[in-house]
């Protein structure tokens, strides 16, 4: 029986292994993690992450051929194929701080694999890692090999949170990078055979190691670039009276461009886009390519500009101050159908409003109060002037309340900021919300989810990103 072990029970490792277990009933799959609370959650009725369809997959396989354990060394030693799906955050200190990936967890996983292995292993990079990481891992394993053969493969994930299970069931492609040696090709074939249980052969792409590693960074950079491109156009639309939805639709009809990732918004977030672009920037700088590095930096600068532009629009619209005013924030996760708040634009928007002494009431259907307070207590990392992350002043907490109902969040508010495109925000009773707000009542739609005209008929002053401005807003500066 083939045995697979995955180190890391997070957003990538858990769902990926659950689907492999579902599709390959003859393979034993064990997900290991040093965090007991996390593993306990995976073994409970309340999984540690929210992802549509995940519950059903886990419950069907758990205890049959899918297991979650804290006994990391035992299961690593027994496995034929080891996926490494540990966190690779951006470094916050030292060489490359603010840009380079921190491979501390990766290196400790590699050293542990070398320590406990008693048979040949295929080690698969599942985390997003810098180009040439495989080479470094290979060196650690071979220098500590004790006669054991290791083959390193790169098998980057291309999941989108909120649709991860769907993406795993029907992937656009599965990418496997390996050494172009007989042993390397054999390892690639072994992993191909796992995916071939449900993925058509023409969707399984094999490359060399470095191409696979760079493909993941490039894919995320291209996607983020599209978002920053349409967001840059949204600012111009507001200045000229054009409608960004119409522009994006027209542009997306070009078959060379296509319609995806052309929705203007308050900005992109999530664990990957910013981290991977900064990683790409660092690799370019290290390879003497400053022009290329600056090109990709601009994608993040536009994203930061879009968030600050949104905050400035809120403040300038409300008589140039939100001091002491209640602002309802609807949505805190970085996108709908996930509870993930990593790099969510909501953090920067809230910080901007708190900086002007607003009183903020936050509602998100999937994010806990504890998570929101933790996120807001962390200062923004300035990647051009690196310093270690420090908590902000605790005084900010007094201005923030977290509630479990959109109507409670908006009661008595002067303005509403929609920062996540949860479906429920499209169907709220906005007449009821309007009746219970201070007047004039403002809606700042950071995701373009509401029907602005209907809200104006109710009496709201509405700002939608990249759409023709409400008469009230036309004379207000977009950027302070």
From Swiss-Prot:
It catalyses: UDP-alpha-D-glucose + 2 NAD(+) + H2O = UDP-alpha-D-glucuronate + 2 NADH + 3 H(+). GO terms for cellular component: nucleus. NAD(+) binds at residues 8-13, 33, 38, 86-90, 127-128, 161, 272-275, 342. GO terms for biological process: glycosaminoglycan biosynthetic process; UDP-glucuronate biosynthetic process. SUPFAM superfamilies: 6-phosphogluconate dehydrogenase C-terminal domain-like, NAD(P)-binding Rossmann-fold domains, UDP-glucose/GDP-mannose dehydrogenase C-terminal domain. Pfam families: UDPG_MGDP_dh (PF00984), UDPG_MGDP_dh_C (PF03720), UDPG_MGDP_dh_N (PF03721). Involved in the biosynthesis of UDP-glucuronic acid (UDP-GlcA), providing nucleotide sugars for cell-wall polymers. Belongs to the UDP-glucose/GDP-mannose dehydrogenase family. This is UDP-glucose 6-dehydrogenase 4. The lineage of its organism: Eukaryota, Viridiplantae, Streptophyta, Embryophyta, Tracheophyta.
């Amino acid at each position: 029986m083939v045995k697979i072990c995955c180190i890391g029970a997070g957003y990538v490792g858990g769902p990926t292994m659950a689907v492999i277990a579902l599709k390959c009933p003859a393979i034993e799959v064990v997900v290991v993690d040093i965090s007991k609370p996390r593993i306990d959650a995976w073994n409970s009725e309340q999984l540690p992450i929210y992802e549509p369809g995940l519950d059903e997959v886990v419950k069907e396989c758990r205890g049959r051929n899918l297991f979650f354990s804290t006994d990391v060394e035992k299961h690593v030693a027994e496995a034929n194929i080891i996926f490494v799906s540990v966190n690779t955050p951006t470094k916050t200190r030292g060489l490359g701080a603010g840009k380079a990936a921190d491979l501390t967890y990766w290196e400790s996983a590699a050293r542990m694999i070398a320590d406990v292995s008693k048979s040949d292993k295929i080690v698969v990079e599942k985390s997003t890692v810098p180009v040439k990481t495989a080479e470094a891992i290979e060196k650690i394993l071979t220098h500590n090999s004790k006669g054991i053969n290791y083959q390193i493969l790169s098998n980057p994930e291309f999941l989108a949170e909120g649709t991860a299970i769907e993406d795993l069931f029907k992937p656009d492609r599965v990418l496997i990078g390996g050494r172009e040696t007989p042993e390397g090709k054999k390892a690639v074939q072994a992993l191909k055979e796992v995916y071939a249980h449900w993925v058509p052969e023409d969707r399984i792409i094999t490359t060399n190691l470095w191409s696979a590693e760079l493909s993941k960074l490039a894919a995320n950079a291209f996607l983020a670039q599209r978002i920053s491109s349409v967001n840059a156009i949204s600012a111009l639309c507001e200045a000229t009276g054009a409608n960004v939805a119409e522009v994006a639709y027209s542009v997306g009809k070009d078959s060379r461009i296509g319609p995806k990732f052309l929705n203007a918004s308050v900005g992109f977030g999530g664990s990957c886009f910013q981290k991977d672009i900064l990683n790409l920037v660092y690799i370019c700088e290290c390879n003497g390519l400053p022009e290329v590095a600056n090109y990709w930096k601009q994608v993040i600068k536009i994203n930061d500009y879009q968030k600050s532009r949104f905050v400035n629009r809120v403040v300038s619209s409300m008589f140039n101050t939100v001091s002491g005013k209640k602002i309802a924030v609807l949505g805190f996760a970085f996108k709908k159908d996930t509870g993930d708040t990593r790099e969510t634009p909501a953090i920067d928007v809230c910080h901007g409003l708190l900086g002007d002494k607003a009183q903020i009431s936050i509602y998100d259907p999937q994010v806990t109060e504890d998570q929101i307070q933790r996120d807001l207590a962390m200062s923004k990392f300035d990647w051009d002037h690196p310093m270690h992350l420090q908590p902000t002043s605790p005084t900010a907490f007094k201005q923030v309340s977290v509630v479990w109902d959109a109507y409670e969040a908006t009661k008595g508010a002067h303005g509403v900021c929609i920062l996540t495109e949860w479906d429920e925000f499209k169907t709220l009773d906005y007449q009821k919300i309007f009746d219970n707000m201070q007047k004039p009542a403002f809606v700042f739609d950071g995701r373009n989810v509401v029907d602005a005209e209907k809200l104006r008929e109710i009496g709201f002053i509405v700002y939608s990103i990249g759409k023709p401005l409400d008469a009230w807003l036309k004379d207000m500066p977009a950027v302070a």
